[in-house]
UniProtKB/Swiss-Prot annotation:
Transmembrane segments: none annotated. Signal peptide: none annotated. The gene is proC. This is Pyrroline-5-carboxylate reductase. SUPFAM superfamilies: 6-phosphogluconate dehydrogenase C-terminal domain-like (SSF48179), NAD(P)-binding Rossmann-fold domains (SSF51735).
Amino acid sequence: MENQKIGFIGAGKMGSALMQGTIKAGIVTPENIGASDVYEPFLKDLQAKLGIRVSTDNAVIVRESDILILAVKPQTLSSVLSNLKNEITSEKLVISIAAGVPLSTYEDALLEGTRVVRVMPNIAATVSEAASGIAPGKNATPEDLKAALEIFSAVGTAVQVPESLMDAVTGLSGSGPAFIFPVIEAMADGAVLEGMDRKSALTLAAQTVLGAAKMALETGMHPGELKDMVTSPAGTTIQGIHSLEEAGIRAAFMNAVIRASERSKELGKK
């Protein structure tokens, strides 16, 4: 992939995170990355920081690229696709990260045979710890899927899923960081209530969540088994777990994922 040119249509937080991640991973060199955006000062900053090519004209970046990453808001996607329809040929791979927008939207709006891959990353891409679901379109090749997996693995973990589960991915990992931030805050609040200073409490709470996540990923053990490892009879941990269960923590998190997934489905129909 190192000789292929990647173009970003939209250079916001997610787009710029992907640029930095792919450069850092050595997947692509800065001179082979182009980015377009309506906000020219931001583009100039990216150019100075990363050494990439920039333009306020989307079509310029499309013409110069082999792989296009559409990193624009869902509400502006329709006009972007309409304006670029004749520029995006079947020789180019299109990767979109617009939430809730089905593959059929791109395949209907673009020229026949256009290769499209749909990706749902999350905000943790900004710290190279994203969780991304990837669904290839009907015209995408195995090489296209491999390229998408390589790009998004540069900023975290990426897995292939059928498009029918992309709304579930949105509800789980797309929205998920926002579900965890209040958990970190609440745990820290509990320690503050016990007399700890806020900075130390937040540091310990965030590290606790990070450590627990790493244990789940690296050991491959069921979360229930890991919980039991630190839960002694009549100990402190089981008292805390009892309080969480009384508050319905499991149902609350399950419902959060379900509601977010349902909202993603609703947005996809608009």
